Amino acid sequence: PEGTDLMFYEGLHGCVVTDDVDMAQHVDLKIGVVPVINLEWIQKIHRDTSQRGYSNEAVMDTILRRMHDYVHYIVPQFKSTDINFQRVPVVDTSDPIIARDIPTPDESLVVIRFRRPDEFGVDFPYLLQMIHDSWMSRRNSIVVPGGKMGLAMELILAPILRKMLGK
């Protein structure tokens, strides 16, 4: 809306904090969207072999080469996110190297964790009512069916963004 500042950033380093950089300090609403690591690897292996023509071995070499950065720069960002959406498959993903298919949203659950739910006025009873088959796993976390992730994002983020933009 006119007279407001809204910047949307999507990428790996939106909340990165190092000795030289502190991106997190500049962000008003930090949202993490991350699959569990085996699902992340399955997605990468599938994409890089089927769409980019790499061999399984080349993709695994890339994953292993990037592991230090993943552990030291990517993962630590999630401790400062306000809301995390983590997709968790409910099918066997124990060996991502041999997985033939990427689990579908309907073969997944999404764990949504709020760092400080009171700060954003999260209405858990409303979310539980609106998102069929959802439940609370902790006082600040709700679990929703994978196919309802878009609905959950809309129900959670729309009121937060309206409030932030002064509407």
Regions found by a protein language model. Give the residues of each.
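C-terminal accessory "lid"/substrate-recognition subdomains
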Residues: 2, 6, 23, 37-167
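Inter-motif core of Ras-like GTPase G domains
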Residues: 22-34
